[in-house]
Amino acid sequence: MAGASLGARFYRQIKRHPGIIPMIGLICLGMGSAALYLLRLALRSPDVCWDRKNNPEPWNRLSPNDQYKFLAVSTDYKKLKKDRPDF
């Protein structure tokens, strides 16, 4: 057991205790969902600036009908009018 690799020990534990398979599946699903949500926040959020030289204020380039929220229940972004100045 001391020389066994991590994968072999993991497989042995799953073989001995098959009840932990759903728990491992749910943990993997949760970790995958969290990683995808962080990726979405990093790529779609107007507050994140990856290139400070070419685009120092990315939130100024958003038009009023750009939906950047994850879920907008009562707002129809297609009908909004522009109410701010251009920079």
Curated annotation (Swiss-Prot):
<comment type="similarity">
    <text>Belongs to the complex I NDUFA4 subunit family.</text>
</comment>
<protein>
    <recommendedName>
        <fullName>NADH dehydrogenase [ubiquinone] 1 alpha subcomplex subunit 4-like 2</fullName>
    </recommendedName>
</protein>
<dbReference type="InterPro" id="IPR010530">
    <property type="entry name" value="B12D"/>
</dbReference>
<dbReference type="GO" id="GO:0045277">
    <property type="term" value="C:respiratory chain complex IV"/>
</dbReference>
<dbReference type="Pfam" id="PF06522">
    <property type="entry name" value="B12D"/>
</dbReference>
<dbReference type="GO" id="GO:0005739">
    <property type="term" value="C:mitochondrion"/>
</dbReference>
